[in-house]
Regions:
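Flexible "stalk/tail and boundary" regions
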Residues: 1-7, 12-13, 22-86, 90-91, ...
Length: 150
């Protein structure tokens, strides 16, 4: 499982280290490959990063749906066609393709955030703004918090 948030730096070749706890989770999943794709929450762009096994489960779910559904087609055009498979190198880094890095507006400093079965890569400034906005929305919504049943 992927949880927590970590600040990392993208090097001049576009590589970024996968946080050590996330590398440990990948070892536990016996996954050596990752799939990166575009994502957006509200107006904040980032990259979703899936272990290959989780990505394959997502593709299986998508394949079981009506492939002619216009909404599903739009989603697949955005989410699946933009996906890029990569390996974690011997130093625990992944190469972020320039097209994906440009989409997410990634600067030199990024935040890598866990989201249970996958993780996200954000530009640090974008993540700080998004986190602050989400904190206000979540903590201010007592009805939602009360209904979580956790």
């Amino acid at each position: 499982m992927f949880r927590g948030h970590f600040e990392h730096t993208i090097d001049e070749k576009g590589r970024v280290a996968v946080p050590a706890p996330f590398r440990g989770a990948l070892v536990g999943l016996q996954d050596e490959r990752l799939v990166l794709t575009k994502f957006r929450q509200d107006a904040a762009r980032c990259l979703d990063v899936y272990p290959l096994s989780a990505w394959r489960r997502l593709e299986e779910k998508l394949s079981s749906r009506n492939r002619f559904d216009p909404k599903l087609l739009r989603f697949r055009n955005f989410y699946v066609t933009g996906a890029h498979e990569c390996a974690v190198d011997g130093q625990g880094r992944i190469l972020v393709p320039q097209l994906l890095g440009d989409y997410a507006g990634l600067g030199r400093t990024v935040m890598i955030t866990g989201d249970v079965e996958m993780f996200r890569i954000w530009d640090k400034a974008v993540w700080q703004d998004k986190f602050a906005a989400d904190e206000e929305k979540v903590l201010g919504d007592e009805e939602f918090l009360g209904g979580l049943d956790i």
